[in-house]
Regions:
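A short, N-terminal "cap"/entry segment at the start of jelly-roll beta-barrel domains
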Residues: 1-31, 41-43, 109-110
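Short intrinsically disordered coil segments
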Residues: 49-50, 108-110
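Short hydrophobic/aromatic patches on the structural cores and recognition surfaces of FHA
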Residues: 58, 74-75, 93
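Short acidic-glycine-tyrosine-enriched beta hairpin
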Residues: 65-82
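Ligand-binding loop in jelly-roll beta-barrel domains
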Residues: 81-106
Protein backbone atom coordinates (compact mmCIF):
# COMPACT_ATOMS: atom_id res chain seq x y z
CA UNK A 1 0.00 0.00 0.00
CA UNK A 2 1.20 3.51 -0.83
CA UNK A 3 -0.15 6.67 0.77
CA UNK A 4 0.72 9.93 -0.99
CA UNK A 5 0.70 13.42 0.50
CA UNK A 6 -2.49 14.30 -1.40
CA UNK A 7 -4.26 11.38 0.31
CA UNK A 8 -3.59 12.69 3.83
CA UNK A 9 -5.85 14.76 6.04
CA UNK A 10 -4.25 17.89 7.48
CA UNK A 11 -5.07 19.50 10.81
CA UNK A 12 -3.53 22.92 11.39
CA UNK A 13 -3.34 23.59 15.12
CA UNK A 14 -1.41 26.87 14.68
CA UNK A 15 1.56 25.79 16.79
CA UNK A 16 1.93 22.66 14.66
CA UNK A 17 0.55 21.06 11.50
CA UNK A 18 -0.33 17.35 11.45
CA UNK A 19 -0.81 15.29 8.26
CA UNK A 20 -2.46 11.94 8.96
CA UNK A 21 -1.07 9.15 6.76
CA UNK A 22 -2.53 6.21 8.67
CA UNK A 23 -5.26 6.58 11.29
CA UNK A 24 -6.82 4.29 13.87
CA UNK A 25 -9.90 4.07 11.63
CA UNK A 26 -7.68 2.58 8.90
CA UNK A 27 -5.52 0.30 11.07
CA UNK A 28 -5.57 -0.85 14.69
CA UNK A 29 -1.89 -1.82 14.48
CA UNK A 30 -0.28 1.61 14.09
CA UNK A 31 -0.94 5.23 13.19
CA UNK A 32 1.48 7.43 11.25
CA UNK A 33 1.51 11.24 11.20
CA UNK A 34 3.83 13.81 9.64
CA UNK A 35 4.21 16.68 12.11
CA UNK A 36 5.57 20.13 11.35
CA UNK A 37 6.19 21.86 14.69
CA UNK A 38 6.18 25.65 14.31
CA UNK A 39 6.52 26.63 17.96
CA UNK A 40 5.50 23.96 20.48
CA UNK A 41 3.26 21.03 21.37
CA UNK A 42 1.34 21.13 24.65
CA UNK A 43 2.20 18.82 27.54
CA UNK A 44 0.54 15.44 27.01
CA UNK A 45 0.20 12.15 28.90
CA UNK A 46 0.09 8.94 26.85
CA UNK A 47 -2.58 6.34 27.63
CA UNK A 48 -2.52 2.78 26.29
CA UNK A 49 0.06 3.24 23.53
CA UNK A 50 3.68 4.00 22.72
CA UNK A 51 4.43 7.14 20.67
CA UNK A 52 7.66 7.68 18.75
CA UNK A 53 8.96 10.80 17.02
CA UNK A 54 11.70 10.60 14.40
CA UNK A 55 13.22 14.02 13.66
CA UNK A 56 13.47 14.59 9.90
CA UNK A 57 14.70 18.19 9.97
CA UNK A 58 15.06 21.30 12.08
CA UNK A 59 15.89 21.39 15.77
CA UNK A 60 14.27 21.87 19.14
CA UNK A 61 13.81 20.10 22.42
CA UNK A 62 11.68 17.38 24.00
CA UNK A 63 10.74 17.09 27.65
CA UNK A 64 9.82 13.51 28.58
CA UNK A 65 8.85 12.94 32.22
CA UNK A 66 10.36 16.33 33.13
CA UNK A 67 13.74 15.48 31.54
CA UNK A 68 14.76 17.83 28.73
CA UNK A 69 16.71 16.62 25.68
CA UNK A 70 17.82 18.47 22.55
CA UNK A 71 16.26 17.29 19.29
CA UNK A 72 18.22 17.17 16.04
CA UNK A 73 17.78 15.42 12.68
CA UNK A 74 17.76 11.61 12.88
CA UNK A 75 17.08 11.55 16.65
CA UNK A 76 14.32 9.21 17.85
CA UNK A 77 12.19 9.96 20.91
CA UNK A 78 10.08 7.21 22.50
CA UNK A 79 7.19 7.99 24.86
CA UNK A 80 5.72 4.94 26.60
CA UNK A 81 2.29 4.38 28.11
CA UNK A 82 1.81 6.64 31.15
CA UNK A 83 4.68 8.99 30.34
CA UNK A 84 4.32 12.74 29.81
CA UNK A 85 5.94 14.75 27.05
CA UNK A 86 6.04 18.09 25.29
CA UNK A 87 8.26 19.55 22.60
CA UNK A 88 9.23 22.89 21.13
CA UNK A 89 11.23 24.27 18.23
CA UNK A 90 10.97 24.35 14.46
CA UNK A 91 11.03 20.67 13.45
CA UNK A 92 9.66 18.26 10.87
CA UNK A 93 8.97 14.84 12.37
CA UNK A 94 7.44 11.46 11.68
CA UNK A 95 5.14 10.33 14.50
CA UNK A 96 4.47 6.60 14.87
CA UNK A 97 1.97 5.22 17.41
CA UNK A 98 1.76 1.55 18.41
CA UNK A 99 -0.98 0.47 18.62
CA UNK A 100 -2.84 3.08 16.57
CA UNK A 101 -4.10 6.03 18.62
CA UNK A 102 -6.89 8.56 18.66
CA UNK A 103 -7.88 11.24 21.17
CA UNK A 104 -8.74 8.57 23.77
CA UNK A 105 -5.05 7.62 23.99
CA UNK A 106 -3.74 10.88 25.39
CA UNK A 107 -4.56 13.54 27.94
CA UNK A 108 -3.74 17.20 27.34
CA UNK A 109 -2.12 18.54 30.52
CA UNK A 110 -1.76 22.27 29.68
Amino acid sequence: MKISLDQTQAKDKGEFLARFYLTKEQSDDASVIFVECRTRHYKTKMKGAKRMYFILGGSGSFIINEKQETANPYDLFIISNGETYEYSGAMKMLELNVPATDSSNYEKLD
